[in-house]
A protein has these predicted regions:
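Core alpha/beta nucleotide-donor-binding catalytic domains of modification enzymes
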Residues: 1-159
Length: 159
C-alpha cells in the first residue's frame, strides 16, 4: 500500500510539470479536500505556489458552512483561499448546469498556470450520459478530458 504523503510529482501530466502556480477548486467535498491535501504535499516539495478557490453558490442551506469549512481547512494547510459568492439563475438546462457555468466563470479568473478540479468516476459517467441524452457527437461523448485549456494562460486539470 502506498502512503498518500508520497504523492509523486509524476502524477502531474507532462504538460503540467513546469507549472509554478496551481490553484485547486475546493468545494469542501471529499474529492476536492483529498486533492488539495495531496497537492499541498507536492507543492512543498516542488516549490509550487498553491492556492485554492471556493465558489459559494448559495444553493444549499449548508453553503455558508461549506465556505467556513474551506476557510478553516485552507488555514490548517497554510494555503491561500480565493472565494466568490455567485448568483445562480436556472436556465433551460437546469440549476446544476447554471451552477457549473457560474463556477467555471470564477475558475476562469484564476492567475494560476493550472486549475486542478477533483472528480470521481460517477462524474465522468454523468457527463457522458448527459452528452448522450443531448445527442452529443464524438467529442461530447468523450466526457471530461484530463487536461484542457481553461483560459489563455491556464490549463484545467482533472486528475
Amino acid at each position: 500500500m502506498h502512503d498518500l504523503n508520497d504523492f509523486p510529482a509524476q502524477a502531474l501530466p507532462d504538460g503540467l510539470r513546469h507549472a509554478r502556480h496551481i490553484e485547486a477548486a475546493l468545494s469542501g467535498g471529499l474529492d476536492s479536500v483529498v486533492l488539495l491535501h495531496l497537492l499541498s504535499r507536492l507543492a512543498g516539495r516542488l516549490n509550487i505556489k498553491l492556492t485554492a478557490v471556493h465558489v459559494h453558490h448559495g444553493l444549499q442551506d449548508e453553503a455558508d458552512g461549506w465556505l467556513e469549512f474551506c476557510r478553516g481547512y485552507c488555514g490548517r494547510l497554510a494555503v491561500p483561499l480565493r472565494w466568490q459568492k455567485v448568483d445562480v439563475v436556472s436556465d433551460v438546462l437546469g440549476i446544476e448546469a447554471a451552477a457549473r457555468q457560474a463556477r467555471y466563470r470564477v475558475f476562469g479568473e484564476t492567475e494560476a498556470d493550472v486549475l486542478a478540479a477533483a472528480h470521481h468516476a460517477d462524474d465522468q459517467v454523468e457527463t457522458f450520459m448527459l452528452a448522450a441524452l443531448r445527442g452529443g457527437g464524438l467529442r461530447a461523448l468523450s466526457a471530461m478530458p484530463a487536461v484542457r485549456p481553461l483560459n489563455r494562460r491556464t490549463l484545467l486539470w482533472r486528475p
